[in-house]
């Protein structure tokens, strides 16, 4: 799945925790315009939680 398709829909972002067995510290739903406001950590610092539970990091 490309980055562009994420911009076209809501994005669920999970922030990395020191203890991977725990659920993500924060799960937030973003609209594309919200991401670019700078009110949240840059996309480079986030892991995208895919529906199947896998994680893909955009750098």
Curated annotation (Swiss-Prot):
Keywords in alphabetical order, please.
Mitochondrion, Plasmid
Q: Where in the cell is it found?
A: Mitochondrion
Q: Does the keyword Mitochondrion apply?
A: yes
Q: Mainly localized where?
A: mitochondrion
Keyword check for Mitochondrion:
yes
Sorted alphabetically, the Gene Ontology cellular component annotations on this record are: mitochondrion
Q: What is this protein called?
A: Uncharacterized mitochondrial protein ORF4A/ORF4B
Which species does this protein come from?
Ascobolus immersus
Q: What is the lineage of its organism?
A: Eukaryota, Fungi, Dikarya, Ascomycota, Pezizomycotina
